[in-house]
Amino acid sequence: GKGNVIRRMFREIDAECYIMIDGDDTYPAEFGREMVTKVLERNVDMVVGDRLSSTYFEENKRPFHNFGNSLVRGTINHLFKSNIRDIMTGYRAFSYQFVKTFPVLSKGFEIETEMSIHAVHKNMLVENVIIEYRDRPDGSESKLNTYSDGFKVLKTIGRLYKNYKPLGFFGMLSALLVLIAAILFIPVFVTYLKTGLV
């Protein structure tokens, strides 16, 4: 899986700057220079190649991927008070500090979500670079399954939110349980007011 490859790469390679790019010919390589410059000269810890602010929604022919990207981005930015414009992009640059402090837990495509949350939670410097996006070449099929991998990503967000912000996670869970209890209690209470019986 993708996460396993990233784990081994980060463990075995020592460098001042790392670039991660998907091998499906959807990301133009020329944006790499600007991303590397931000890491080496401006001490940025993670540079995010932002597809969503340029050509992604025009080029990508998979509508549920578009919806999923927007959902994941909105959820993470809301829960973690961040402003990462493209959570799921496979085009990123990293500093040595990021790579050597990142505990790779995911095995598959949810790795990008984990990277984004790690950087935000550790107060690392994150910047976005708007990049062009091309749809996959004809005959090239994505290994990403919209539904099963989408569910894994949402599950990863929930797990990491619980680990990084337990008060917020269990506070929301408690509020939900209180709401359910109140809904179940109201009919019983109304019956009691009318009849005096429970």
Question: Where is each model-derived feature located?
Answer:
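Acceptor/aglycone-binding surface of glycosyltransferases and processive sugar-polymer synthases
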Residues: K2-I13, C17-M20, A29-F109, D135-F151
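Short beta-strand segments
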Residues: I21-D22, I130
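Acidic metal-phosphate-binding loop of nucleotide-sugar-dependent transferases
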Residues: D25-T26
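Hydrophobic helical membrane-anchoring modules
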Residues: E34, K81, L105-K107, I111-V198
